[in-house]
């Protein structure tokens, strides 16, 4: 382990790490904010030669729960915070600034657990209350259980292609198309043995395109093998019948003709 001292205490509770090309580490902590650290030494004996801490609300513990780091490039970094939304690193001011001051209708939307971005520059914010497709402070869409999602909590987001993403939840995986705003869910009934996933436990193999999602009882791998998606037609059941406003029992009809 490499100790990181910040004043009189160790920097701990690290939840996410991002490494830049010039041996610089960004660390997101659940409770202690964000640290930028420079690594020196050798591969067998790495040392931290410089570390700078970034906090919000004067370092108050409950305000500095940072769960995830998303890098648009080497200098444009976003940090997901539990309770206070998304922050961006400002290289000019050398500080964190909020991406949005929007007051969502549900405060759990500010619990940011995962971040992604599509080809149209829409951000995807995985929250405790669903997925936010964010264009600007005044333009965003929310997708959650009310829209048919398996579960509201989005633990991780991985990009499969330019506008196709996989999301992990507490009840399975969701394949989401940001271009068409359509999705398909995969849970226990679809053969998944792991359905309850963990915060940030996701990885994309850039060489093979394979996606990995970690859950409480194992790992799910999604391989980009070029197979075409199979069409699925769910069973259709009629439980009500209304003819000119009058209710009938569908079971009473041996045949039902619908003219469109």
Residue positions per predicted region:
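Residue-level "micro-hotspots" composed of small/polar
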Residues: 5-13, 44-47, 58-64, 104-112, ...
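Solenoidal tandem-repeat scaffolds enriched in leucines and small polar residues
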Residues: 11-17, 25-30, 61-67
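Residue-level detector of Asp-centered blade-edge/turn motifs that repeat once per structural unit
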Residues: 19-22, 71-74, 117-120, 159-162, ...
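Conserved beta-propeller blade signature
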Residues: 24-27, 76-79, 122-125, 164-167, ...
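Loop/turn residues immediately N-terminal
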Residues: 30-34, 82-86, 128-132, 170-174, ...
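Short loop/turn segments that connect beta-strands within beta-propeller blades
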Residues: 38-43, 90-94, 135-139, 177-181, ...
């Amino acid at each position: 382990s490499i100790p990181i001292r910040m004043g009189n205490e160790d920097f701990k509770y690290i939840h996410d790490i991002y490494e830049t090309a010039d041996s610089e580490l960004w660390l997101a902590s659940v409770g202690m904010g964000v640290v930028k650290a420079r690594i020196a030494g050798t591969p067998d004996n790495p040392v931290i030669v410089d570390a700078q801490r970034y906090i919000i609300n004067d370092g108050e513990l409950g305000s500095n729960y940072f769960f995830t780091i998303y890098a648009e490039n080497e200098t444009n970094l976003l940090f997901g915070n539990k309770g206070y939304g998304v922050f961006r690193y400002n290289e000019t001011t050398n500080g964190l600034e909020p991406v949005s001051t929007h007051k969502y209708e549900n405060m759990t939307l500010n619990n940011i657990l995962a971040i992604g971005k599509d080809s149209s520059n829409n951000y995807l914010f995985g929250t405790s209350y669903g997925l936010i497709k964010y264009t600007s402070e005044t333009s965003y869409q929310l997708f959650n259980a009310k829209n048919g999602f398996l579960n509201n909590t989005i633990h991780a987001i991985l990009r499969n292609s330019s506008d196709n993403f996989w999301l992990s939840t507490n009840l399975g995986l969701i394949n989401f198309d940001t271009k068409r705003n359509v999705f398909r869910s995969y849970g226990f009934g679809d053969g998944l043995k792991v359905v309850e996933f963990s915060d940030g436990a996701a990885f994309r193999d850039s060489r093979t395109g394979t996606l990995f999602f970690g859950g409480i009882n194992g790992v799910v791998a999604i391989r980009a093998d070029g197979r075409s998606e199979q069409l699925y037609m769910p069973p259709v059941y009629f439980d009500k019948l209304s003819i000119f406003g009058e209710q009938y029992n569908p079971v009473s009809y041996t045949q039902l003709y619908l003219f469109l």
